[in-house]
Amino acid sequence: MLQISARFYCKIAKQQISELPKISKPSKLLDFKQLHHPTKVPQTPVPTAFPDATNNSEIEIDAKTIQLLERLSLVDLDSEQALATLKSSIQFADKIEHIDTHNVRPLYTVLEHQQLQLRNDRVAEGDCREQLLRIAKVTDEDYYVSPPGNIPLEQLDK
């Protein structure tokens, strides 16, 4: 009985496939090589011109500021490459700070065509600081203490 019904369905499927319209022109198919942007992510960096409201002079960072940044970020900034990266990041931040965003609405999600349901900003469960601090292995002044990065926490004289 099972073989008969399976064969019956195969015959129906074969008839339906034969009744489908034939694609006569394969040129109507989408050719991804002809698209300017086949994906939403560009394959190469896209150069963007920023308004040049600031001067492009070299940024000078004193040793005390570098020590403070090393202590806060737990990243060693001794190499020239690390300092160059830090300076270029500061210059980039300075450039984007001068971009006019007066008439630009805030972006809550990167999906521009979908609504993002925002919840009310209120405390649902609160006053559990002591309970959360008991879970931590190491605390200092009611803060979690994380393991250090690539430099010791003690300050070294440079």
UniProtKB/Swiss-Prot annotation:
Q: Which GO terms describe its molecular function?
A: ATP binding; glutaminyl-tRNA synthase (glutamine-hydrolyzing) activity
- Keyword Cell division appears in the UniProt entry: no
Q: Which Pfam families match?
A: GatC
Main EC class the enzyme belongs to: ligase
What InterPro entries does the entry give?
Asp/Glu-ADT_sf_sub_c (IPR036113), GatC (IPR003837)
Q: Where in the cell is it found?
A: Mitochondrion
What EC number is given for this enzyme?
Answer: 6.3.5.-
Q: Does the keyword Protein biosynthesis apply?
A: yes
Q: Which GO terms describe its biological process?
A: glutaminyl-tRNAGln biosynthesis via transamidation; mitochondrial translation; regulation of translational fidelity
Q: At the top level of its lineage, which domain of life is listed?
A: Eukaryota
What catalytic activity is recorded? L-glutamyl-tRNA(Gln) + L-glutamine + ATP + H2O = L-glutaminyl-tRNA(Gln) + L-glutamate + ADP + phosphate + H(+)
The UniProt record's further free-text remark is:
This protein may be expected to contain an N-terminal transit peptide but none has been predicted.
**Similarity-based family:** Belongs to the GatC family.
User: Which function does this protein serve?
Assistant: Allows the formation of correctly charged Gln-tRNA(Gln) through the transamidation of misacylated Glu-tRNA(Gln) in the mitochondria. The reaction takes place in the presence of glutamine and ATP through an activated gamma-phospho-Glu-tRNA(Gln).
Q: Which PANTHER family does the UniProt record give? A: GLUTAMYL-TRNA(GLN) AMIDOTRANSFERASE SUBUNIT C, MITOCHONDRIAL
Subunit-structure text: Subunit of the heterotrimeric GatCAB amidotransferase (AdT) complex, composed of A, B and C subunits.
Q: What is this protein called?
A: Glutamyl-tRNA(Gln) amidotransferase subunit C, mitochondrial
